[in-house]
């Protein structure tokens, strides 16, 4: 099984969309294996967005991501990185297709509700930033046999 990091950004938290977003992931059959509410510090922001720190838009990104709590979630599932990114839609909410999270709930490029890892490497790096090894819960869902075939 593959794991990915999902961050419900300050706009998602402030707009009280946490439950709606989590419901969509759960309805898709994705498995929550860790979750916490936290305030991103400027230091954590710089670590998370290290590739953007020198870019002109970074100061506003840091200001936004540190402005209110976020919900960090570790999701597990088959091809979960691709599946989650498909569910999110285009980065810019104005360009995201209806039916995607951003298409349904966002109309902004920066305030686009959710961050998700874009590769296995970034997923591992980001999961390590937000969670300690002992914070992951490995458990079986009784519904798993009804979500996909054994050979998938």
From Swiss-Prot:
Signal peptide: none
Record keywords: ATP-binding, Cytoplasm, Kinase, Magnesium, Metal-binding, Nucleotide metabolism, Nucleotide-binding, Phosphoprotein, Transferase
Gene Ontology molecular functions: ATP binding; metal ion binding; nucleoside diphosphate kinase activity
Protein EC: 2.7.4.6
Residues at the active site: 115 (pros-phosphohistidine intermediate)
Cofactors, names only: Mg(2+)
InterPro entries, per database record: NDK-like_dom, NDK-like_dom_sf, Nucleoside_diP_kinase, Nucleoside_diP_kinase_AS
Pfam families: NDK
Compartments where found: Cytoplasm
Binding positions (ATP): 9, 57, 85, 91, 102, 112
Gene3D superfamilies: Nucleoside diphosphate kinase-like domain
Catalysed reactions, as listed in the record: a 2'-deoxyribonucleoside 5'-diphosphate + ATP = a 2'-deoxyribonucleoside 5'-triphosphate + ADP; a ribonucleoside 5'-diphosphate + ATP = a ribonucleoside 5'-triphosphate + ADP
Gene Ontology biological process terms in this record: CTP biosynthetic process; GTP biosynthetic process; purine nucleotide metabolic process; pyrimidine nucleotide metabolic process; UTP biosynthetic process
CC annotations in GO: cytoplasm
Enzyme class: transferase
PROSITE patterns (UniProt xref): NDPK, NDPK_LIKE
HAMAP family, per database record: NDP_kinase (MF_00451)
PANTHER family referenced in this protein's UniProt entry, alphabetically: NUCLEOSIDE DIPHOSPHATE KINASE (PTHR11349)
Task of the protein: Major role in the synthesis of nucleoside triphosphates other than ATP. The ATP gamma phosphate is transferred to the NDP beta phosphate via a ping-pong mechanism, using a phosphorylated active-site intermediate.
Subunit structure: Homotetramer.
Family: Belongs to the NDK family.
UniProt name for this protein: Nucleoside diphosphate kinase
Species assigned in the record: Rhodopirellula baltica (strain DSM 10527 / NCIMB 13988 / SH1)
């Amino acid at each position: 099984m593959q794991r990915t990091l999902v961050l419900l950004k300050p706009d998602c938290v402030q707009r009280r969309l946490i439950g709606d977003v989590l419901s969509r992931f759960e309805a898709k059959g994705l498995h929550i294996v860790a979750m916490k509410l936290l305030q991103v510090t400027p230091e954590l922001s710089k670590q998370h967005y290290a590739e953007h720190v020198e870019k002109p838009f970074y100061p506003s990104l840091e200001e936004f991501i540190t402005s209110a709590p976020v919900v960090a979630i570790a999701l597990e599932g088959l091809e979960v990185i691709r599946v989650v990114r498909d569910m999110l839609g285009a980065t810019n909410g104005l360009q995201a297709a209806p039916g995607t999270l951003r298409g349904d709930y966002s109309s902004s490029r920066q305030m686009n509700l959710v961050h998700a890892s874009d590769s296995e490497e970034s997923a591992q790096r980001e999961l390590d930033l937000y969670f300690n090894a002992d914070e992951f819960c490995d458990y079986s869902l009784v519904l798993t046999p009804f979500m996909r075939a054994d050979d998938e």
